[in-house]
Amino acid sequence: MSGRTDDKTMGWMDLLAFGRAEIKALHKTWMAFFLTFYVWFNMAPLVSTIIKDTGLTLDQLKVLAICNVALTVPTRVLIGMLCDRIGPRKTFCIVMWTMAFPCIWFAFATSYTEMLISRLILSAVGTGFVVGIAMTSLWFKPRDAGFSQGVEAGLGNWGSSLAAITLPFLALTVLDSWRWAIAISGMVMFAYGTYYWFAITDGPVGTKRPMARKAQAIEVSTWGDLVSAILWTIPIVGVLALLVRTVTNKAYITAETSYLFYALIVAGVLYQVMALIKVNVPILRKGVPDDDKYRFTQVGTLCMSYVVTFGAELAVISMLPFFFQKVFQLSPVMAGLFGSMFAVLNFFSRALGGYVSDRMTTRKSAHLIYLAGVAGGFVLMALIGPEWPLALAVAVVMICAMFVTGGCGTTFALVPFVKRRITGNVAGYAGAYGNAGAVVFTTAYTFLTDNQFFLMIGGTAALTFVFCFFFMKEPAGAFAKEYRLSSVDTEIMAGGH
């Protein structure tokens, strides 16, 4: 069990201390994350305008929406690896610079094929989340990991919400062009990437960080963990098969084309497995010092936790407005208002989850409390029916949303403590599983009633609680002034790797 070495932890008012280097770094980083999410979600608010201007059908736009998330899951892992190898500053700038081009390409595309390809490439911009987590972990002490990560992720996630609010206004009122509205968002992101390159460092000036030895795959500590890592890696690419199945069933692509995509998915899985073996066999043959070992099940607990928090959040956001409209006979506007509660609460409750994690006696106990709240919250939501008072239904949804989004905060409060030099890798795995969870939940929803859907998520959260209760370890030094470094970290920092 970890004990505190200093009770002076970061609080809400510290966010206004702009003279402190770490606070300035936090604000610069959440803004970078914010812009990547603004660009990632810059199509959805303009769907009706795009259809009217281009003559595309709603089904064609739905395929574009699937392309918009298709590569996010596997690229989050790849970008996490890159973070650990070259640092989050360079990685963030690479993401912002490179993703600006498919954004602008999509804006001025002259054919549907161009729109498909550009949107597919642009789905990788969703990796900005992983880079922000890695950068924040370098600037803040272990005792402040939860709150700082929660603030960065909470504010950054608002990029999608602000895109929904501002882009229609910009496209229809200010610019009179959906193409320029989307293109300018990419240009702004590119410009901010250039600013970010000069405005920040990987942690406080003068500090050194241990780098991962290889960028191709996550490092493990035992042969058993290598098998575990392979099993946990397969779904990250394999989940894309569900997206292919969806577009095939809706006749968006032919069966013959789907076979090609399935073959590419299998090839991607095999590549990831071979990369894990190639990176880790030499390390394991040489032997891993005891102070450098970690259990891969620790990564697994965070992956499953993010499935039932962020994955559930994305899945529920997609159906909640219609749920309110159907159950309580609300207008689309009112249903949308109540259905947006998950997104609106994101900053406050996610930061609150991290804040609670920083202040409890153990981070594991804080996390388990939130997981129990997620399970209980969705069970209560499954009981909502037309006989309920609307106010009570809204209260239940708000409570559930507080636990779900707060659970995102307690999950990433644990990420930096798995193994210091692979924080980006761990964030990539957890982030990828969050998106994969959303794909699985939304696919399952097509076979379930609303109540069954909520019960399924609640049951999955309950199983995750049990999994974490038995297999999650309280990290050493979770409230310390500095992160613990292993003998291998020290050797790498000295240039001996």
Model regions and ranges:
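Extracytoplasmic gate region of multi-pass secondary transporters
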Residues: 43-45, 233-263, 297-340
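Central cavity-lining transmembrane alpha-helices of secondary-active solute carriers
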Residues: 63-80, 340-353
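Helix-loop-helix hairpin linking two adjacent transmembrane segments in secondary transporters
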Residues: 152, 156-266
